[in-house]
Amino acid sequence: MGYGVAQKRAKVTNSIAKVSEKTLNVGANANPAQALAGAVAGVKVDITSGSPSATPSITIRGGSNYDGGSNEPLVIVDGVIRSSLSDINPNDIESMEVMKDAGATALYGARAGNGVIMITTKQGKNGKASVSFNAKVGLNYYNLGYNMCSDEDYLYYYRLALQNCEWTLPGGKYASAYNSNLYGTNNPGGIGRTELSQGQSYNILRKTDDNAYLLQKGWSEMLDPVSDNYILYRNIDPLEMNGRTPYVTQDYNASISGGNDRGRYYASLGLYDADGFIKGTFYKRYNFALTGSYKITKWLESNSVFNYTRSNWLNDDPMLDTGYFMNRGQAFKFVRYRDEDGNDLYGTGGPTTNVNVNNGNFDRDFQADKFSMTQSLTATLLPGLTLKGTMSWYYNEEYDESFNHQYINSQAGAVNPNGNNGVNRSYNTSASFSRYFDQTYNLVANFNRVFAEKHTVNVMAGTEFYKRRYRGFSAGGYGAPTGYFPGLGLTQNDADVQSRSMSSFHNEEALLSYFGRAEYDYMDKYLFAATFRADGYSRLVNNKWGTFPGVSGGWVFSKENFWNKLGMENIINYGKLRASYGMNATINSSYLGYYTLQGSYSAYKYDGVYGYRVSTLPNPNLKWEKTRTAEVGLDLGFLNNRFNLGLTYYNRLTMDKYSALSLPRTTGFSTVTYNNGQYRNAGIEFDLQGTLLRTRDFQWTFNANITYNKNTIVKLPENGLQNNRQGGSEVYTGNGDETHYVGGYQEGQTPGSFVGYGVVKMARSQADIDALGDYIDTGVSNGAAVYANEAGRQRLLAMGYTNLVQLMPGDFIYEDRNGDNWVEAKDRKVLGNLTPKWTGGFNTTLTWKGLSLYARFDMGFDFQVYDSNIAFWLGEGQGAMAFNDAVRDTWTPDNPGAKYPRVVWASQYGTDNYIRTNSFFTQNGSYLACRELQLSYVLPKSICQKLACQGITVSVTGQNLGYIKSCTIPLPDHTTYTSGNTAGWGGTYNVPRTLLFGLNVTF
């Protein structure tokens, strides 16, 4: 329950879920949060990146923010508040509890508005020393998630896409405006280049007798579908240049523990070493933990916990832009990464860069060191009365350093690295250092007694002081005379060239708290608890103090005499009704920065004079963001607790939530943080655990949960607009010219909706177009206007449109919602919502003798996703994108019944079948994901004894094995959302599939 107060499960009157040690340690996870997906009702884990250093996001019961604020719960490890779970070794965790309702989390007051994750690390146990060694080695397989089309198919459809464009390209009808090296310019045949030059960017040529020899050097040929020429081409997969698959993850842990009646100890060492998909990227973490307890006297006990973590990482290559994984599948084929003699070339930049040309040219050193120490003394003053004093220190230091030697940044530099073209010699160098130090001191008294063998009283009271000091600086520069030394002092910095920059920051915050909890139960049947906390927070200037009460109660009706008289005890042996109500707050909000309330300042120079100005507008009157939660629940045990069922209804209201208010530009500020209304999450949680089958040698157990959650914006500040809306789009309701606003944020609406055009059908033939009359469409992404016939064209001209494109067979016909035969922005509608209404998961274990099969799944239902990737590829959004295999099912005169519209080069400048958000690419996002599947075997004791050990377990595990889904996007549990108007799968760093081999030995 927190602050060292233990409580029996049967007496718990709040929503507290415990995560098993097995769940946390089946796979190789850099972050324990990865193992929570689908493990706890009401907890949603978004694993949004396959980067080995990625930090999953955790949301409990829908969170308290919908507009960009943090929904992360409070993380407490051995009494120490942590910023995240990222530096915690899962192998050191003894127990993890998720506190969800305010009746429980009110004890942590101002920081627990999004729930609490409480972790207790392993402690020593009485007995002789036990030594354990655990090793896991995994092979990670990169998964793009789409089947891209073959080289020949790509060229075939790309050339048709050029032929289908209705406008004149700068270089001729069949020439690509993307790059003159690709197809040539001013050439009606479309492919002008016939000679292969060293500096050429693409392996594309028009075949001639002089270059036919390339067919003997790995090139291929095909007939150009729009001319009588043959095309020579050679493709080198960017994966071969920049990536690696499989790539390796290693996880090693060793521990020793033991103890006796006077003292106990536990010590561990851990190494987690994971390569990334991009060559040279990695995440490495070293862990050391030491815990000990010692009875100084009969009435005084000491407990000590020490943890140290060092992390090193490199997340990406400097030459690959941040959009690499978005563009990895989109990148144009046939980039010239290597010449015919096997020499590396540069490529074309961005996602199509060959990182091998710059091996050793970039120095990167990113390192974080984290220490935590907790020391407590517990004194037993009287029977049942204890006094515990605890001090906790948490130190987090990060140092980042970067230096660029001479490096190649174009194809010309790869051809001639000693020349002046395509070579960067600016020798950029930078370094940054940050440090924060958290101190927590608390004193807690606890009284626990049983009176007359019926009345149990447990009272706790305490006070706590928390302080954080955060310091840091950064500096950078360029223009050093040499690339051999990375010193900032060598960079050029004179009156003509100011190449150096530097900054620093100094921040502090403090929290003073008083808290207490009282529990009473009568004969384990009637349960009551009350919690109170008062917090004073330094950042809230005029509203420092907040109070956070919580109450809960329970009735174990299965202990009543009438239950036995009904004869139910043999079926439902345990039954408890519970209810709770409480309040807490959120101060770990991303909106509540160090300078949010008092303002910040920056230097400036005007007319030769230096001064300073306010750069962040302060808001000293900001109030506490409070969360009020009420819940009722029912816990049942069946067949002597062989099966256990839990049902909970919760209703959580976030009041005075933090948000950023946009300000007029005339104020000189972009935003100010303010209290922005009320937000409600309400839902139902179901938990079911049990043993399906048990014999002497065989056992089958399972654990399942599912949650329904609905979130609603209840109240926004009065602004005179409909539903006090913030943002949104005006659209027709479907009732004539009547309009309303959708998207954005509005009272009474659910955030997460996205807006787009409804697709009526695809024009399969000219007859479908002729039936449209004077139909016009001005909803094109880039300002063009579409007409069906001459009457529509004249209509557009009269409206002032000049960039006109005719609707063709193979194009979409969009929904006209007000009946004026004109598709415009107001004809859009809500296409779906990106937030699953139902989430959950289940795991199951089948054990036969020493053999065990374990599987873990999570799921989400009743929501929509938008596949913007296929739309962007087939729409040729930048004029030169790759195609996935859906291109084979696009409309052509020979395939009028195709699923997808015709492919047109740079579709957004034409009829825009693909780039604009529409209902065609809106899909059901429901999914079932297989997170882990493990087969393990415990060797017989007779074999272990011969090997001088107590136990040996070997295992093979598959992680992130895939989804059962109907949508086309690879990760239906990860979508993007912006103000209710746009949606899509952004093409992130996909989570890899992993094959993991494990060994655990205990001595």
For every predicted segment, state its role.
Residues 229, 410-412, 495, 537, ...:
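Extracytoplasmic gating/loop element in the C-terminal half of outer-membrane beta-barrel translocons
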Residues 1-275, 279-289, 296, 301-303, ...:
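Short, small/polar-rich motifs associated with maturation and membrane association
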Residues 132-227, 474-475, 674, 693-830:
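Conserved small-residue
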Residues 77-80, 99-102, 111-115, 248, ...:
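Short, glycine/acidic-rich beta->alpha junctions
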Residues 42, 51, 264-266, 848-868:
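Glycine-rich phosphate/pyrophosphate-binding loops
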Residues 14, 21-29, 71-74, 285, ...:
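Extracellular/periplasmic, surface-exposed regions of secreted and cell-surface proteins
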